[in-house]
Amino acid sequence: VEKEFETGHWLHFAAVYDGQYLRLYLDGEQIHFVETRNGGTINLSMAYDGHTWEDTFAIGRSAGYARFFDGYISECRVWNVARTTAELEDGICYVDPTSEGLISYWRFDGETQEDGTVLDMTGHGHNAKPYGDITYVDNQKCPF
């Protein structure tokens, strides 16, 4: 994506894959799309089946695991349905953890288990394990 992102304030970023197209959204507006080569489903099973850190689904690092996100991530959600633009806009600030199609929902607000685990708010058990030196920022209000 050839877009400069303004820093110093919160952004809502979403990626939606419908089996043919990958669409990227910023604050509810589509900013990029690309047709995928082979289509089909995306396999995220490595996120939950105990592979080594280098092989797992990760939030805030590149697939090559050498580059890490430099900023704050308030929440992350994984759906097994392609969300519409209207659904993305409606869910920018809040989504019901029991919503149909929501398979993982993590809030990075400092509410963790004793071992640092961030609980999956959906109840599906896809809990997240922080890696490295994590700083949590609590009491953030959705600016949208």
Question: Language model features by range: what are they?
Answer:
Residues 48, 89-144:
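Extracytoplasmic low-complexity segments
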Residues 12, 56, 75, 104-105, ...:
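Extracellular/lumenal ectodomain signal focusing on beta-strand-rich modules
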Residues 1-44, 63, 131-144:
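Extracellular glycan-interaction surfaces
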Residues 19-21, 29-30, 63-64, 78-87, ...:
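Acidic glycine-/aspartate-rich tracts in secreted/extracellular proteins
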Residues 13, 73-78, 120:
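Extracellular beta-strand elements of beta-rich domains used
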Residues 47-75, 83-91:
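Extracellular glycan-interaction patches encoded by glycine-rich segments
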Residues 2-11, 16, 49-53, 65-72, ...:
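Extracellular/lumenal carbohydrate-interaction signature centered on repeated Trp-anchored short motifs
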